């Protein structure tokens, strides 16, 4: 009996060792690429991205490798966001989450059943490194809303850019609760970092993204999007024991809008939306810009507002219009003449006895024509003698 137990324990120990090896091993599908190339070959993962330069959409796409982005929340929206940025060749991704992958997450995109039980940041880092080994992946497995961890989060986003000691270029919020959004808002206001807030509604049929520039646009404490759009208190949305709905379609669309605007900001092309919503029921995409609240509860937001107001505002360029006296069209086949607005209008001479006072005819009516006279005139013009109708009938019968 003891021998069988020892054998089982040995098998269990062997399986544990194998499992740990699988957890720590990272698959590398290809060698790292030092420089992006626009060469159109099957082995170049960046050829389709670099084509944006050839089509004059982006001036220098390779600058994306100099950018560092922090993603807070690696769930339905955050994991897809990280996947898209990795495929786009971002320089560095910093992932924050403290949750684990569960089978209940499988209705969303990105994660697979064999990753159940792993921390989300660990599972994401393995998959992303396999997709694109050129991207630097940094993970942080803790809750940013606690006092101790908030300080670590604050330091990380302010000093963990690609250059040591430099802040990240952009922060993307993909969390699902009010407290985490407020923590990100406070950290970005304090560090004066631009960031995107994103979210999907509890019923899974609407989403939004909001680009927040401290001092210039409303921060999350100034006007939370759901409070503005639907008059809902966001603190009531995340409730214990209540299962929120989720659709991979809504998650994917929201993540796509988020990454699209992040790329436009990082690579300086197109127009970045300050607020962009999505309603899946009628495919409605509202846009708006929210001004900061002068009485915001966040003291760093008020400080950034003062700094923004003190900056010299760019002057609008006035374009001088060149006015030419020459006619726009030299030819005038139709004899059209331009008349000044103050030119006198010729009055019609038509009899207007039946027209009410203060009115005039729009055109001159033709004179009434006597049909009998016109017929007789036609006969004369035809050179025929004037003959009565009875004579004509008699002539026809005699023929």
Curated annotation (Swiss-Prot):
<keyword id="KW-0067">ATP-binding</keyword>
<feature type="binding site">
    <location>
        <position position="301"/>
    </location>
    <ligand>
        <name>Zn(2+)</name>
    </ligand>
</feature>
<feature type="binding site">
    <location>
        <position position="296"/>
    </location>
    <ligand>
        <name>Zn(2+)</name>
    </ligand>
</feature>
<dbReference type="GO" id="GO:0050905">
    <property type="term" value="P:neuromuscular process"/>
</dbReference>
<dbReference type="Pfam" id="PF00899">
    <property type="entry name" value="ThiF"/>
</dbReference>
<comment type="function">
    <text>E1-like enzyme which activates UFM1.</text>
</comment>
<dbReference type="InterPro" id="IPR035985">
    <property type="entry name" value="Ubiquitin-activating_enz"/>
</dbReference>
<comment type="similarity">
    <text>Belongs to the ubiquitin-activating E1 family. UBA5 subfamily.</text>
</comment>
<keyword id="KW-0862">Zinc</keyword>
<feature type="binding site">
    <location>
        <position position="177"/>
    </location>
    <ligand>
        <name>ATP</name>
    </ligand>
</feature>
<feature type="binding site">
    <location>
        <position position="120"/>
    </location>
    <ligand>
        <name>ATP</name>
    </ligand>
</feature>
<feature type="binding site">
    <location>
        <position position="143"/>
    </location>
    <ligand>
        <name>ATP</name>
    </ligand>
</feature>
<protein>
    <recommendedName>
        <fullName>Ubiquitin-like modifier-activating enzyme 5</fullName>
    </recommendedName>
</protein>
<dbReference type="GO" id="GO:0071566">
    <property type="term" value="F:UFM1 activating enzyme activity"/>
</dbReference>
<dbReference type="GO" id="GO:0046872">
    <property type="term" value="F:metal ion binding"/>
</dbReference>
<keyword id="KW-0833">Ubl conjugation pathway</keyword>
<dbReference type="GO" id="GO:0005829">
    <property type="term" value="C:cytosol"/>
</dbReference>
<feature type="binding site">
    <location>
        <position position="219"/>
    </location>
    <ligand>
        <name>Zn(2+)</name>
    </ligand>
</feature>
<feature type="binding site">
    <location>
        <position position="97"/>
    </location>
    <ligand>
        <name>ATP</name>
    </ligand>
</feature>
<feature type="active site" description="Glycyl thioester intermediate">
    <location>
        <position position="243"/>
    </location>
</feature>
<dbReference type="GO" id="GO:0071569">
    <property type="term" value="P:protein ufmylation"/>
</dbReference>
<keyword id="KW-0479">Metal-binding</keyword>
<keyword id="KW-0547">Nucleotide-binding</keyword>
<dbReference type="InterPro" id="IPR000594">
    <property type="entry name" value="ThiF_NAD_FAD-bd"/>
</dbReference>
<dbReference type="InterPro" id="IPR045886">
    <property type="entry name" value="ThiF/MoeB/HesA"/>
</dbReference>
<feature type="binding site">
    <location>
        <position position="76"/>
    </location>
    <ligand>
        <name>ATP</name>
    </ligand>
</feature>
<dbReference type="InterPro" id="IPR029752">
    <property type="entry name" value="D-isomer_DH_CS1"/>
</dbReference>
<dbReference type="GO" id="GO:0005524">
    <property type="term" value="F:ATP binding"/>
</dbReference>
<feature type="binding site">
    <location>
        <position position="222"/>
    </location>
    <ligand>
        <name>Zn(2+)</name>
    </ligand>
</feature>
